[in-house]
C-alpha cells in the first residue's frame, strides 16, 4: 500500500515539471516566428539573431540552440518560413505568411510550371518506355512466335523455298537437257524414217 502511495505522488511532480516547462515559454516555432516578426528585416533574419532574441525575451533551457535549429528546419519544410540565404539551419529566413497573396499566386504558377515541366518529363519517359517496350516485345514475342511457328512454318517455309528452287534450277536443266535429246532423237527418228 505504501508503494502505491509513494509512486502516485512521484508521477504528479513530473506532470508539474512538464506544465512548468510549457508555461516558461511558448513553442520554439512560435518564438522563432515572433523573433523574425520583431526584426522585420527584408533580407531575412539569421539564426544567430533569432537565438539572441529568443534568449533575451524568453526563459529557455540549455538546449535552446538545438531546439531553435530544429524548429527553423521544420518551419522551412512546412512552408511557414522562407530561406533567403544559406542552406539548412544556417542562413537568413523570412516569414512566408506576409507573402500569402503572392505565395498563393506563386503556388499556382509553380503548380502550372511543375505541370509543364512534369508533362515533358512524363512524355519523355513514356517515349523512352515505349521505345524500350517495343524493342523488348518484338525480341520476346518473335521468339515465342518463332517457336510456335517452327512446328508449322518449317513445312510452309520449306515448301515455298523448294518450290521456287526446283522450278528455277530444275526447269532449266530438265528443259535444256530433255529438249536437246528429244530434238536429237526426233532428228534421228526422222532420219531413220526418211
UniProtKB/Swiss-Prot annotation:
GO terms for molecular function: double-stranded DNA binding; nucleosomal DNA binding; structural constituent of chromatin. The modification ADP-ribosylserine is found at residue 104. GO terms for biological process: chromosome condensation; negative regulation of DNA recombination; nucleosome assembly. ADP-ribosylated on Ser-104 in response to DNA damage. One of its GO terms (cellular component) is nucleus. Residues 1-29, 84-194 are annotated as: Disordered. The modification Citrulline is found at residue 42. It comes from the Eukaryota. Disulfide bonds: none annotated. Residues 24-97 form the H15 domain. SUPFAM superfamilies: Winged helix' DNA-binding domain (SSF46785). InterPro entries: H1/H5 (IPR005819), Histone_H1/H5_H15 (IPR005818), WH-like_DNA-bd_sf (IPR036388), WH_DNA-bd_sf (IPR036390). The modification N-acetylmethionine is found at residue 1. The modification N-acetylthreonine is found at residue 2. Residues 105-194 have a biased composition (Basic residues). The keyword Cell membrane does not apply. Pfam families: Linker_histone. CDD domains: H15. Belongs to the histone H1/H5 family. Histones H1 are necessary for the condensation of nucleosome chains into higher-order structures. The histones H1.0 are found in cells that are in terminal stages of differentiation or that have low rates of cell division. PANTHER family: HISTONE H1, HISTONE H1.0. This is Histone H1.0. It comes from Pongo abelii.
